[in-house]
């Protein structure tokens, strides 16, 4: 495959989320004046554990599942990040897990949380498994990784196809191994087991805060603003609801099967009532558009909240939004980012916009550690304060240095890890 003359990257490289992440980290460290060895330390996770998990299935057979856990950097504190149940494992998926653990480190640095990044999961399709099979699998995974996780080592959380029930099973299994009730081992738990108010909607809350701040910078009134949301899963559906309730006009939404568009605004409450547990709603309608058409709709604010590599050099010239806020991980390629920046479209990067989830997970961990719990209003107030501060810090750095917000965010995120590593004597 031919390489791009300007970057040396092949087309495949451009869609490789790990290589893209490493490229921006390298550039951020160069701008901050750090030597090459800092990049060598931070460019990949410090640990990637792969485990085999035997599970007795309901029919009596034993199936062997593969699990993994990546820990990027623990110079600042315990690593932190989600556990996903994903049906496919390929070299590309392992690269994605590495990149996700790095993004978690960046998010924690940006919000100033005492964590590094982690990420993990199990190769399975939960849609084909019974309730009890999922429980046995969840407990088996915890037994397999128990030596490298814990409240002061690595604190997991929910991710793709995992939820508060799975977190509860995992917490219970770890507590049995630890011989001590350990709610701080994992976050995203049910409230009755030490979960935090606001955790389920935290990612969307954080994105909403960033949208409002970005709209202020560009002089856009949220009331009546035209919003398009790609993705109608947890983050996308909550976000559409929050935007609708704030007075915005949500003119487009989509799921994996297509999109819906109404220039007068969609009935979000109606759609929420009819979506299934996997965030699917468009199959109920005949008059749909493609995800590609949805991204290119005329709107004020576009929120990619689905999967990576959605805005690329192929379609970035066609984006008509004034602001793009990344609720998903890695939805815009580096080439797409440059095109949007050149066109003066404000892009709020994923490592900032989607940091609400890990921030409220941190709140849950703090509440577990101190045994004192906050109201939903207190959680939302603390989240808004931290997100607004981080947004303004990055926006000002981007303006002062004449760089895009993604590079500015990476500079803030890597600096904390680099300094912690330096003081520890690692570099």
Swiss-Prot record:
<comment type="similarity">
    <text>Belongs to the Glu/Leu/Phe/Val dehydrogenases family.</text>
</comment>
<keyword id="KW-0560">Oxidoreductase</keyword>
<feature type="binding site">
    <location>
        <position position="361"/>
    </location>
    <ligand>
        <name>substrate</name>
    </ligand>
</feature>
<dbReference type="InterPro" id="IPR006095">
    <property type="entry name" value="Glu/Leu/Phe/Val/Trp_DH"/>
</dbReference>
<dbReference type="Pfam" id="PF02812">
    <property type="entry name" value="ELFV_dehydrog_N"/>
</dbReference>
<dbReference type="GO" id="GO:0004352">
    <property type="term" value="F:glutamate dehydrogenase (NAD+) activity"/>
</dbReference>
<protein>
    <recommendedName>
        <fullName>Cryptic catabolic NAD-specific glutamate dehydrogenase GudB</fullName>
        <ecNumber>1.4.1.2</ecNumber>
    </recommendedName>
</protein>
<dbReference type="Pfam" id="PF00208">
    <property type="entry name" value="ELFV_dehydrog"/>
</dbReference>
<dbReference type="GO" id="GO:0006538">
    <property type="term" value="P:glutamate catabolic process"/>
</dbReference>
<comment type="subunit">
    <text>Homohexamer.</text>
</comment>
<feature type="site" description="Important for catalysis">
    <location>
        <position position="159"/>
    </location>
</feature>
<feature type="binding site">
    <location>
        <position position="234"/>
    </location>
    <ligand>
        <name>NAD(+)</name>
    </ligand>
</feature>
<dbReference type="GO" id="GO:0006520">
    <property type="term" value="P:amino acid metabolic process"/>
</dbReference>
<dbReference type="InterPro" id="IPR006097">
    <property type="entry name" value="Glu/Leu/Phe/Val/Trp_DH_dimer"/>
</dbReference>
<feature type="binding site">
    <location>
        <position position="80"/>
    </location>
    <ligand>
        <name>substrate</name>
    </ligand>
</feature>
<dbReference type="InterPro" id="IPR006096">
    <property type="entry name" value="Glu/Leu/Phe/Val/Trp_DH_C"/>
</dbReference>
<dbReference type="InterPro" id="IPR046346">
    <property type="entry name" value="Aminoacid_DH-like_N_sf"/>
</dbReference>
<comment type="function">
    <text>GudB seems to be intrinsically inactive, however spontaneous mutations removing a 9-bp direct repeat within the wild-type gudB sequence activated the GudB protein and allowed more-efficient utilization of amino acids of the glutamate family (called gutB1). This 3 amino acid insertion presumably causes severe destabilization of the fold of the protein, leading to an inactive enzyme that is very quickly degraded.</text>
</comment>
<feature type="binding site">
    <location>
        <position position="203"/>
    </location>
    <ligand>
        <name>NAD(+)</name>
    </ligand>
</feature>
<feature type="active site" description="Proton donor">
    <location>
        <position position="119"/>
    </location>
</feature>
<dbReference type="InterPro" id="IPR036291">
    <property type="entry name" value="NAD(P)-bd_dom_sf"/>
</dbReference>
<keyword id="KW-0520">NAD</keyword>
<dbReference type="InterPro" id="IPR033922">
    <property type="entry name" value="NAD_bind_Glu_DH"/>
</dbReference>
<feature type="binding site">
    <location>
        <position position="107"/>
    </location>
    <ligand>
        <name>substrate</name>
    </ligand>
</feature>
<dbReference type="InterPro" id="IPR014362">
    <property type="entry name" value="Glu_DH"/>
</dbReference>
<dbReference type="InterPro" id="IPR033524">
    <property type="entry name" value="Glu/Leu/Phe/Val_DH_AS"/>
</dbReference>
